[in-house]
Amino acid sequence: MVKTFQAYLPSTNRTYSCVHCRAHLASHDELISKSFQGSQGPAYLFNSVVNVACGQTEERVLLTGLHAVADIYCECCKTPLGWKYEHAYESSQKYKEGKFIIELAHMIKENGWD
């Protein structure tokens, strides 16, 4: 049986996919930073993602201070991937609002990474 995804990214773009089900998650063009830390190790910050569902928003104290975040999950296999920044309380962290953290442990590179 073939799984279908909500959104497919163009095959001409370098993409990041769910390591468990290979659903597309983000285009390399949407990558903002590789210098983030998730709860399970290194993580990337993306401007936008696809095939991702958000949980409830909650306040958490992260390495850079208090934030309101929502956990994100792969829509296809329900694997926890990281979180979405809903609100940053520190003015220096406002750039993260509306952005997404995906942990490296949960994604793979596909399409054109030769």
UniProtKB/Swiss-Prot annotation:
Any one GO BP annotation for this protein: regulation of synapse organization
Effect of disrupting the coding gene: Larvae display reduced nociceptive rolling behavior due to impaired activation of second-order neurons (SONs) in the nociceptive pathway and reduced the synaptic contact between nociceptors and their SONs.
Keyword match Zinc: yes
Residue sites binding Zn(2+) per the record: C18, C21, C74, C77
Tree of life domain: Eukaryota
UniProt-listed Pfam families: Yippee-Mis18
GO molecular function: metal ion binding
Keywords noted in UniProt: Metal-binding, Zinc
Residues of the Yippee domain: 14-111
Metal-binding is among the record's keywords: yes
Family: Belongs to the yippee family.
Function, as annotated: Involved in regulating synaptic transmission in presynaptic neurons. In class IV dendritic arborization neurons (nociceptors), involved in regulating activation of their second-order neurons (SONs) and maintaining synaptic contact between nociceptors and their SONs.
PANTHER family per the UniProt record, alphabetical: PROTEIN YIPPEE-LIKE CG15309-RELATED
Name of this chain's protein: Protein yippee-like
Originating organism: Drosophila melanogaster (Fruit fly)
